[in-house]
C-alpha cells in the first residue's frame, strides 16, 4: 500500500534542507502495509474513478484522505445539516456545518502543520520526467514497478474518449499532450499495441491530426533529446542570449523567472544538440509517430508546424522571421570555428546558472519542467556528477498519488499557500478556541517556512530578487520568494499575533515581520501593481517573442490583481498593528496598489483572475483589496460595479459555477449544465460580504449559504468538482484543499457578519 510520508528524508545522503524537511511530502510503497479492508477501500475508489472518468475528470484525492483521517480520527461527528428554505438557516445550523467542516479539515492536516494535497492537473509534466530518466538510464532505479503501474493508470485514466490527451486533465486532446503521453507509456514499458487498444487509439489520433511534426516547440525539444525528432526541426534556442548586456530589454534575466528558468536548460541542450541513446524503443517511435518515413520528413518545414488543436498563441510574423534568420544564418556560424568559441562560452554561462538554481533550491528547482531539464543538463555535463545524484531524491517531491493514479505535480506542492488560506478561513469562523491545536500546528509551520536569508552572491549577477523575510508557495527548501505568498503568510502571522500565545503559539518576532514587509515593499512596480516573484523587468511587447504556442503571457512577470490585493491587505493589517514602522512608505504603497486595482478593473465590473477560475477569483481579490484600502459600496464605483457583476452571475441553485473556459477565452463562462461550484461560491460570497451586501440585500448571501450547507458531505468534507487553478491563461491545475478552505471561510464570514445582522430582513 502507498503511504504518504511527511517531513521525511527517507534516509537519503543526497538530501539537503534548511529546516529539517518541514513541508516535504512524498509517497512510498510498502507491500506489507494495508489491511484487507483498507486495500479494498482503495481499489473501490480506483474502480469508481475509472468508471466515471469521462464525466468526472478530477480525482477526489482519496488515498491521502483515507490515510490521514485514519491517523487523525475525528471527535464525535455532528449530524449533517439539512436546509429546507433559507428561513431555516439558523446560527446553530451554520455553526454545526462549520464545526463538521473544520473537524474534517483538521484530520487532513499533517503532523508538521501543513495541509498536503494534490497539485496535479497539467498533462505535459510527467513525460519530461520519464524521458529524462530513460535517457540517463535511471528509469528502473528511480521508478519501482509500482510507480510505473500507477503512472500508467493515471495516463490511461486521463486519456480522452477520442484517444488523445489534453494540455490538462479537463482539456480537449492536443498534439502536445497526445504525443508526449504516448511516448511516456511506451518508455514505461507499454507495448505498441498495449493497453486494451488505448495505445492504438492514441496513435490513430496523432496520425489523423498530422503526426508528431505538428507538436508544439516544447514537445519538439523533448522528442529531440530523446532521439525521435531532429534538432534542425526546432526553432533556435541560442544560449548566447545569456551573454547579452543586461540593459537590453530582451535579456533572459528580464524575463519571468519561470520562463527564463525553463529556457535556460533548453538553450543548453539546444546549444549542445544533445541526443540521448538511440534504443530500439526510440527507433520504433520514429516509425509510430509520423505520417511519412522518418528519413523523408522535411525538418525545415516542421520547425514552424503546429497542430491547430494546440495553437493558443500563434507566432507573429516577426517571430517567424527571427527564427528563420537564426536558423539559417546565425546558427551555422555558431556551430563552426570561430563562432564555436562563443557557443562554448555561452554553454559555460548557462550551466553555471543551472547549478546556481539547483543548489539554492536544494535541487527541487522552481518547477517540474526546469527540474527535470536541469537534471538532464547535469547528466549531460557529467553522468557521474554529484549534481546529478543530488537531483534524484528530489524527483519524489513532485510525485503525487490519488485514486486516478500517480501524477507529476506543478510544483513540489502548495503547502504554504494552502496552509495560509486554511488558517485565515478558520480564524474567520471565530471558532479558534475550539481548534487551537490545529491552528497552533499551522502557525508553527508558517514560522518554520519563512525564508530567512537572501540568495548567496551578487543577486544582480544571478538575476534574483531579495528573499530574506519572504514566504514561498510550498516549502522553505524550495525557497523562491513570491509576493502574494509573502503577503498571505504575513497576514496569517499578524492575525495570530492578536490571539493569546497559549492558544495559538508564540507570535513571529517583530524583526522577522519587518523582513517580510521589506520584501513586499520592494516588489511594488512603478504602476502600483505587484507581479509574482520579481519586479516587472521588461516590456509587454516582449510577448511577441513568446515561442510557446500553448501558453499566453509568459515572457515577463506581469502585475496581477491577486498579488496586488494580497500585498495591499497585508500592509493594511501591518499598519494597524505596527503604525510607525516605515509609515510613509507603507501608506504610499497601499495608495498606489489601490489605484492600480481600480485601473485594471474590467468594464463589466469584474477582475480577471490569472491564478484560479477566474472572474469570481479575481473579483474576490479586487473587492477585498479596495475594501482594505478604505473603499466601500457607497464611495467606490468600482465596488458597486463588482457587486453588480457577481450578483448577475448567481445561479438558480444559489451558488456560482465558473468554467475554466473563462480563463482561456477571457469571457465569463458557466460550468456546463449551469452547475454551481463550492469554490466559486465561496469566493463570490467573500467578495459580496466584504462589500457590505448584507446591509443592502442579504438574500443572495442566504441562498449561497444554503447551497454550501447542502453541498457538505456526510463526513464533513465537500465534494471535489471541476478544476479550479490555472496558470499562463490556458493550463489548469488542481488545488485539492480549496473545496474545504473556501466553504469554511465563506460560511465563517457569513455566520459572523451576515446571519445575525440580517435575521430580521430575511425573505423567501
Curated annotation (Swiss-Prot):
Domain of life of the organism encoding this protein? Eukaryota
Keywords from UniProt, A to Z, are:
Isomerase, Lipid biosynthesis, Lipid metabolism, Membrane, Repeat, Steroid biosynthesis, Transmembrane, Transmembrane helix
Catalytic reactions on record = (S)-2,3-epoxysqualene = cycloartenol
One of the GO biological process terms: steroid biosynthetic process
Task: Quote the EC number.
Answer: 5.4.99.8
For this UniProt entry, what is the primary localization, expressed as one broad class? membrane
How does the protein associate with the membrane? Single-pass membrane protein
Sum up the protein's function in the record's words.
Oxidosqualene cyclase which catalyzes the conversion of oxidosqualene to cycloartenol.
Q: Which family does it belong to?
A: Belongs to the terpene cyclase/mutase family.
Name recorded for this polypeptide: Cycloartenol synthase
Species of origin = Kalanchoe daigremontiana
Amino acid at each position: 500500500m502507498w503511504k504518504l510520508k511527511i517531513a521525511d528524508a527517507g534516509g537519503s545522503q543526497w538530501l539537503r534542507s534548511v529546516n529539517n524537511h518541514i513541508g516535504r511530502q512524498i509517497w512510498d510503497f510498502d507491500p506489507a502495509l494495508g489491511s484487507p479492508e483498507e486495500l479494498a477501500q482503495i481499489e473501490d475508489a480506483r474502480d469508481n474513478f475509472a468508471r466515471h472518468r469521462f464525466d468526472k475528470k478530477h480525482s477526489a484525492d482519496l488515498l491521502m484522505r483515507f490515510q490521514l483521517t485514519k491517523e487523525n480520527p475525528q471527535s464525535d461527528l455532528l449530524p449533517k445539516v439539512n436546509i429546507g428554505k433559507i428561513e431555516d438557516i439558523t446560527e446553530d445550523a451554520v455553526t454545526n456545518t462549520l464545526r463538521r467542516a473544520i473537524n474534517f479539515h483538521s484530520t487532513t492536516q499533517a503532523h508538521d502543520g501543513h495541509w498536503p494535497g494534490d497539485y496535479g492537473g497539467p498533462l505535459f509534466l510527467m513525460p519530461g520526467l520519464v524521458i529524462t530518466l530513460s535517457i540517463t538510464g535511471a528509469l528502473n532505479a528511480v521508478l519501482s514497478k509500482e510507480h510505473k503501474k500507477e503512472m500508467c493508470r493515471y495516463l490511461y485514466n486521463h486519456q480522452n474518449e477520442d484517444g488523445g490527451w489534453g494540455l490538462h486533465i479537463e482539456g480537449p486532446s492536443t498534439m502536445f499532450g497526445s504525443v508526449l503521453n504516448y511516448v511516456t507509456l511506451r518508455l514505461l514499458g507499454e507495448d505498441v499495441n498495449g493497453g486494451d487498444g488505448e495505445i492504438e487509439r492514441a496513435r490513430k489520433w496523432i496520425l489523423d491530426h498530422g503526426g508528431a511534426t505538428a507538436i508544439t516547440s516544447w514537445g519538439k525539444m523533448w522528442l529531440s533529446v530523446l532521439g525521435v525528432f531532429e534538432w534542425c526541426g526546432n526553432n533556435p534556442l541560442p544560449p548566447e542570449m545569456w551573454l547579452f548586456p543586461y540593459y537590453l530589454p530582451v535579456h533572459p534575466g528580464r524575463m519571468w523567472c519561470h520562463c527564463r528558468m525553463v529556457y535556460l536548460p533548453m538553450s543548453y541542450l539546444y546549444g549542445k544538440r544533445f541526443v540521448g541513446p538511440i534504443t530500439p524503443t526510440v527507433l520504433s517511435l520514429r516509425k509510430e509517430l509520423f505520417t511519412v518515413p522518418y528519413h523523408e520528413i522535411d525538418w525545415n518545414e516542421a520547425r514552424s508546424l503546429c497542430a491547430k488543436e494546440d495553437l493558443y498563441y500563434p507566432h507573429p510574423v516577426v517571430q517567424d522571421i527571427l527564427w528563420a534568420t537564426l536558423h539559417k544564418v546565425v546558427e551555422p556560424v555558431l556551430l563552426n570555428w570561430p563562432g564555436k568559441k562563443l557557443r562554448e562560452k555561452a554553454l559555460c554561462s548557462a550551466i553555471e546558472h543551472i547549478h546556481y538554481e539547483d543548489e539554492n533550491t536544494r535541487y527541487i528547482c522552481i518547477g517540474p519542467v526546469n527540474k527535470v531539464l536541469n537534471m538532464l543538463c547535469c547528466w549531460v555535463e557529467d553522468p557521474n556528477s554529484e549534481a546529478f545524484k543530488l537531483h534524484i531524491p528530489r524527483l519524489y517531491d513532485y510525485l503525487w498519488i490519488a485514486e486516478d493514479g500517480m501524477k507529476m505535480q506543478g510544483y513540489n506542492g502548495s503547502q504554504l499557500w494552502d496552509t495560509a488560506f486554511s488558517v485565515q478561513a478558520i480564524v474567520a469562523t471565530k471558532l479558534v478556541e475550539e481548534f487551537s491545536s490545529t491552528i497552533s500546528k499551522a502557525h508553527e509551520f508558517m514560522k518554520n517556512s519563512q525564508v530567512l536569508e537572501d540568495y548567496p552572491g551578487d543577486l544582480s549577477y544571478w538575476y534574483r530578487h531579495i528573499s530574506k523575510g519572504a514566504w514561498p508557495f510550498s516549502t522553505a527548501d524550495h525557497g523562491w520568494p513570491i509576493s502574494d505568498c509573502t503577503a498571505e503568510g504575513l497576514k496569517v502571522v499578524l492575525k495570530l499575533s492578536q490571539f493569546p500565545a497559549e492558544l495559538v503559539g508564540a507570535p513571529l518576532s517583530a524583526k522577522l515581520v519587518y523582513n517580510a514587509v521589506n520584501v513586499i515593499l520592494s516588489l511594488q512596480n512603478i504602476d502600483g501593481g505587484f507581479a509574482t516573484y520579481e519586479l516587472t523587468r521588461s516590456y509587454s511587447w516582449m510577448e511577441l517573442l513568446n515561442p510557446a504556442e500553448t501558453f499566453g503571457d509568459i515572457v515577463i512577470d506581469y502585475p496581477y490583481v491577486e498579488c496586488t490585493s494580497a500585498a495591499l491587505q497585508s500592509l493594511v493589517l501591518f499598519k494597524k498593528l505596527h503604525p510607525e514602522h516605515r509609515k510613509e512608505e507603507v501608506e504610499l504603497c497601499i495608495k498606489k496598489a489601490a489605484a492600480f486595482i481600480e485601473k485594471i478593473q474590467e468594464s463589466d465590473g469584474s477582475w480577471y483572475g490569472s491564478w484560479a477560475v477566474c472572474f469570481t477569483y479575481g473579483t474576490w481579490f479586487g473587492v477585498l483589496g479596495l475594501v482594505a484600502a478604505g473603499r466601500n459600496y457607497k464611495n467606490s464605483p468600482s465596488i458597486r460595479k463588482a457587486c453588480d457583476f457577481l450578483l448577475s452571475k448567481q445561479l438558480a441553485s444559489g451558488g456560482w459555477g465558473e468554467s475554466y473556459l473563462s480563463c482561456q477565452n477571457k469571457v465569463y463562462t458557466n460550468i456546463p449544465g449551469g452547475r454551481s461550484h463550492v469554490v466559486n461560491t465561496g469566493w463570490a460570497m467573500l467578495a459580496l460580504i466584504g462589500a457590505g451586501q448584507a446591509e443592502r440585500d442579504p438574500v443572495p448571501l442566504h441562498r449561497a449559504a444554503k447551497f454550501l450547507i447542502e453541498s457538505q458531505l456526510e463526513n464533513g468534507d465537500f465534494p471535489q468538482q471541476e478544476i479550479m487553478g490555472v496558470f499562463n491563461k490556458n493550463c489548469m491545475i488542481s488545488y485539492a484543499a480549496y473545496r474545504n478552505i473556501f466553504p469554511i471561510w465563506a460560511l465563517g464570514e457569513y455566520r459572523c457578519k451576515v446571519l445575525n445582522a440580517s435575521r430580521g430582513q430575511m425573505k423567501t
